[in-house]
């Protein structure tokens, strides 16, 4: 997700976030934010104690979404929103501490973040990777770590349909899908691919 620098600066001025996770160099060095963690090409920045101003004590997160218009918007989520959503998904999917998932969606995407939240909440395992689903190393890691659940949008499943002629890793127990309607032919093909190793 690319964001205009002027727009980003304005968001920071308005919301004064305690933490910012961004690409290195996206936020110019200043006295308000210090880098506390570096991972590959990303930085986690923490706001210094100066000028901390609480806008809304319930506000936890601003998530970017393009919605139906294609123009970026930010949705405010409270601690209660995130907590309720996390617990409802856990209850519905029966996610347990023994579960193992893999990052296949961007963490800046609501669905990708909910996969992280739900698994962390129950003490499950999350396999973090920068490998793309089209890389053999992604599927090797999937098998080696015995990943048992996978989350994706229709595009992820269209990739699986194209590259998984031999079937999916035998450790896979279930998948979840969001982010748009999947056509019936793709659903049928994914089920058939899943059955090959069962």
Task: List the predicted regions and their residue ranges.
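Conserved S/T- and glycine-rich ATP-binding loop of Class I adenylate-forming
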Residues: 59, 65-68, 101, 107, ...
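Conserved ATP-binding loop and adjacent catalytic segment of the adenylate-forming AMP-binding
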Residues: 127-129, 150, 188, 192-198
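Conserved AMP-binding/adenylation subdomain of ANL enzymes
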Residues: 83-100, 110-149
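Flexible, low-complexity linker/hinge segments
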Residues: 36-59
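Conserved AMP-binding A3 loop
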Residues: 60-87
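ATP-dependent adenylate-forming carboxylate-activation enzymes
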Residues: 1-10, 24-26, 124-145, 155-156, ...
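Phosphate-coordination loops involved in phosphoryl transfer and adenosine-cofactor binding
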Residues: 56, 97-98, 172
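Adenylate-forming
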Residues: 22-27, 145-189
């Amino acid at each position: 997700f690319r964001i205009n620098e002027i727009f980003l600066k304005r968001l920071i001025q308005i919301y004064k976030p305690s933490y910012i996770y961004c690409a290195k160099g996206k936020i110019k060095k200043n006295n308000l934010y210090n880098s506390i963690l570096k991972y590959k090409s990303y930085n986690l920045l923490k706001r210094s104690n100066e000028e901390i101003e609480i806008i809304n004590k319930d506000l936890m997160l601003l998530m970017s979404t393009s919605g139906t218009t294609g123009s970026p918007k930010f949705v405010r989520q409270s601690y209660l929103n995130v907590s309720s959503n996390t617990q409802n998904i856990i209850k519905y999917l029966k996610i347990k501490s023994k579960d193992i998932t893999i990052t296949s969606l961007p963490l800046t995407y609501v669905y990708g973040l909910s996969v992280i939240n739900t698994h962390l909440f129950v003490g499950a395992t999350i396999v973090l990777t920068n490998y793309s689903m089209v890389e053999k190393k992604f599927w090797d890691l999937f098998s080696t770590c015995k990943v048992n659940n996978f989350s994706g949008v229709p595009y992820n499943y269209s990739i699986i349909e194209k590259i998984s002629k031999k079937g999916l890793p035998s450790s896979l127990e279930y998948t979840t899908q969001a982010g748009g309607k999947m056509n019936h032919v793709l659903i049928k093909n994914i089920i058939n691919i899943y059955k090959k190793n069962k």
